[in-house]
Structure formats: C-alpha cells, structure tokens
C-alpha cells in the first residue's frame, strides 16, 4: 500500500462536505454541451472551474477552442519531464 494513502483518505474525509458542496455548485450550472442554447452556461461552468482551481492554489485559465472553452490548470509553475500528471475530463 502507498505510504501516502492513509493521509490522503483522511484529508478526503475531513473535506467531504466542502467537496460535495463545490460539486453541487458546478452541477447546478445548466452546462449542456450538446445544446447550442446552453453555450453561455458552458462558458459560465468553465469560468467557475477555473476560479475554483485558483481558489485552491492552481494556476488556471479558460482557453478558447472552436467549440466550448476548455479549462487548463497547473499546480506548479513548471513541470519536470517524467513527473506524473492528471487529465480530468468531466462535467460541463
């Protein structure tokens, strides 16, 4: 077992309610990406995601695409080659 796992699980337990609250805030934004009528809501969701990432210490920005905007966030100014990274593709 990873030696960091117990600390990670404890932190998740401690922040469960706050994490769920953030999730529900995002889910309340009507960001239906398949319906053009909700394009503004998709932008709102992207801005919300970027702002929330910044609140918890990430460098985050909203970037334009040919479709809906995408959110890019980094937890450090530079990434050393070979370090692990995460791609999260989720709601909005």
How should these model regions be labeled?
Residues 2-92:
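Acidic/His- and Gly-rich active-site-bordering loop/insert found
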């Amino acid at each position: 077992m990873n030696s960091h796992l117990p600390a990670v699980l404890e932190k998740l337990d401690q922040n469960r309610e706050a994490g769920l609250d953030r999730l529900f805030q995002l889910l309340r934004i009507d960001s239906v990406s398949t319906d053009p009528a909700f394009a503004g809501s998709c932008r709102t969701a992207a801005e919300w995601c970027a702002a929330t990432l910044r609140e918890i210490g990430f460098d985050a920005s909203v970037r334009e695409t040919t479709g809906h905007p995408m959110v890019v966030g980094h937890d450090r100014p530079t990434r050393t080659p070979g370090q692990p990274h995460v791609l999260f593709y989720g709601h909005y």
